[in-house]
């Protein structure tokens, strides 16, 4: 699944490709992807001009002035721009024809991606309803708030970080990296973390997601950015996907286990389980 660094990289690519372009026609082949009114989606988008492309957590925000098209890539979603003819592909599901003759295509092998066309004034309420946490930046991701939320919860720390309420944008790859960097076992109850561990989790979340953005995201399966290029963050992953390899910190073999139903990579020496 594209996580915050991948979605931010897609955002930057889209802004380069389609900023200022007018949508002249929309073709939708998988109606279930649209979570707001279908007729409004089909009739309102033509004539809209793409004023900016933003992001909140793992959501892309295509700013159309008074309206915002909120796009979530889910597991396999990606955007491609074709300057002329669009080739046949059974995984191409949404087509945005632009005034300059190009077509922005949404591709999704799993068909899990979603679109919500909402008034810009409703955007805050949209994310509040989903209990989306702050962006992982020092200005918005406050240590004291993070600490209070953790200490009041019995949830294991990995599922808690994944649920998007503590901080927006973490997924399975970057959670494993953050937990390893902070020397925290993923099954530890949030309330049992000490202040030093919580500070490390906070600081490493900010650092690692920023590094992921700098490296253009991780291409570990099918991820490509909007320009069709791979990311390079996979070359900097310390624990995710490294089963059997020596821990970069202590040399112990990395192991893979299940936590909260998710495949999880840890160093059993650096990330000791609490008795």
UniProtKB/Swiss-Prot annotation:
Transmembrane segments: none annotated. Its cofactor is Zn(2+). One of its GO terms (biological process) is base-excision repair. It comes from the Bacteria. One of its GO terms (molecular function) is 8-oxo-7,8-dihydroguanine DNA N-glycosylase activity. The keyword DNA-binding applies. The active site is at residues 2-3, 58, 262. It catalyses: Hydrolysis of DNA containing ring-opened 7-methylguanine residues, releasing 2,6-diamino-4-hydroxy-5-(N-methyl)formamidopyrimidine; 2'-deoxyribonucleotide-(2'-deoxyribose 5'-phosphate)-2'-deoxyribonucleotide-DNA = a 3'-end 2'-deoxyribonucleotide-(2,3-dehydro-2,3-deoxyribose 5'-phosphate)-DNA + a 5'-end 5'-phospho-2'-deoxyribonucleoside-DNA + H(+). Its EC number is 3.2.2.23, 4.2.99.18. Keywords: DNA damage, DNA repair, DNA-binding, Glycosidase, Hydrolase, Lyase, Metal-binding, Multifunctional enzyme, Zinc, Zinc-finger. Binds 1 zinc ion per subunit. DNA binds at residues 91, 110. Pfam families: Fapy_DNA_glyco, H2TH, zf-FPG_IleRS. The keyword Nucleotide-binding does not apply. Involved in base excision repair of DNA damaged by oxidation or by mutagenic agents. Acts as a DNA glycosylase that recognizes and removes damaged bases. Has a preference for oxidized purines, such as 7,8-dihydro-8-oxoguanine (8-oxoG). Has AP (apurinic/apyrimidinic) lyase activity and introduces nicks in the DNA strand. Cleaves the DNA backbone by beta-delta elimination to generate a single-strand break at the site of the removed base with both 3'- and 5'-phosphates. Monomer. This is Formamidopyrimidine-DNA glycosylase.
């Amino acid at each position: 699944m594209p996580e915050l660094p991948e979605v931010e990289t897609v955002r930057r690519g889209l802004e380069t490709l389609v900023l200022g372009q007018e949508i002249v026609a929309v073709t939708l082949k998988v109606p279930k992807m649209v979570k707001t009114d279908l007729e409004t989606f089909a009739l309102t988008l033509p004539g809209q001009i793409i004023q900016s492309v933003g992001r909140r957590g793992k959501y892309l925000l295509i700013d159309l002035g008074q309206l915002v098209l909120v796009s979530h890539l889910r597991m396999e979603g990606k955007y491609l721009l074709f300057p002329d003819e669009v080739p046949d592909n059974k995984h191409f599901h949404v087509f945005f024809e632009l005034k300059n003759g190009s077509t922005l295509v949404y591709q999704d092998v799993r068909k899990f991606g979603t679109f919500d066309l909402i008034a810009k004034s409703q955007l805050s309420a949209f994310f509040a309803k989903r209990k989306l946490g702050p962006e992982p930046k020092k200005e918005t991701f406050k240590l004291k708030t993070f600490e209070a939320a953790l200490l009041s919860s019995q949830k294991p720390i990995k599922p808690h970080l994944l649920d998007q309420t503590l901080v927006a944008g973490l997924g399975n790859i970057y959670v494993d990296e953050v937990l390893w960097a902070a020397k925290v076992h993923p099954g530890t109850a949030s309330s049992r973390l000490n202040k030093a561990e919580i500070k490390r989790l906070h600081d490493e979340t900010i650092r690692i997601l920023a590094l992921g953005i700098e490296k253009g995201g991780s291409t570990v399966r099918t991820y490509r950015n909007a320009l069709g290029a791979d990311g390079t963050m996979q070359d900097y992953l310390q624990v995710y996907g490294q089963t059997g390899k020596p821990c970069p910190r202590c040399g112990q073999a990395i192991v893979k286990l299940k936590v909260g139903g998710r495949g999880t990579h840890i160093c059993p020496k650096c990330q000791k389980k609490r008795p």
